[in-house]
Amino acid sequence: MDLTRQEEAILNGEQGAGRQKAMELVTALGKIYGADSLIDITSAHLSGASYKTIGDGGLKYLEDLVAGGAQVSVPSTLNPVGMDRTRWKEMHIHPEFAEKQLRIIDLYGQMGIKKTCSCTPYVGPNVPSMGDHVAWAESSALSFVNSYIGARTNREGGPGALAAAILGKTANYGLHLDDNRKPTVVIDPEIDGSVFSYSLLGQAVGMAIGSGIPYFKNISPEVEEAKALSAAMAASGSMALWHAEGITPEAGNFDISDLEVIHIGKKELENAYDKLNRTEDVQLIAIGCPHLTEKEMHQIAEFLKDKEKKNKDIEVWFCTSAEIRERCAEDVKIMERFGPVLADTCMVVAPIEGTFQRTATNSAKAGNYLPTLCSQKAMCRDITALMELVL
């Protein structure tokens, strides 16, 4: 890799141990993936924030970075953590877990990272522009900004995104390059246009192709639908970029005439649904993976406003960002008749396996991760169908 004189100085430790560690990691990744240089980034979004996922080893790594004077160089936001910072007792969290989780959040804050604790920073404080090079680590969020906004990021891991945030640079390879953003397959779907249908579509596409860059025809996703589609494809497959004809900003740049066309219809959507549903009996309904938007909060509250919770045996959690929870105070009052509106967290990175064994969700992403990361039997349905379980 060709490094500038300043980058060489960082690698040699002339700007402190924290920046040196970051440069060692970014250049190592660049060499692995064949990058010829580093590029400046405008923002970062960091995963690896839950004590459940990073453990004591991750906590020690963050402590070492802070001790080495590490500070982020670009606006940086943080992914959900393992609990609501103030309402963790309502989530059945052990005090020792809570103590270490709060320590992790504090360490990120000491490095200058905004303690947003949300997987949807693009509807809040971290909104890239088309063509911006960024380093984002949350799979659903990076797919959204790559695709719907036209920013450029690879599928960063947590340590890599943090290192890039500290440097304000990342290695120039993969989806930062024009040639690697071309679609590889055309998807011709038949869906009803609901948010849940986009989640099932993403699941079906992941099951059909696994990886690649799909180009969608005949869909018109708004933010909520694009969020669901991005999350599902990143979890059921490994897709970090998609295009939609007439919708996403780069879709008009490509000739798709020679690409394979895959039809996703009723049969494929039913197969996706069956894959995500492994129980008819649940103990927890967890809604908000990725985090609920302001529009979704309004819709849920509108549906629930004249209803009451009758099934007291099933807990209900709604997950969103602290900013949106505060902004939707009237909606929260209605929703909290059914269960807590939690911020900072989600069911996937919380230690729910200590309390629950069967969890329902509206998200194909969560439907994939609940069995593997949380030892749950999962149910996946749209929000209305889920809430009818307790009405």
Model regions: which residues?
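Non-transmembrane, aqueous-exposed alpha-helical and coiled segments at domain scale
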Residues: 1-391
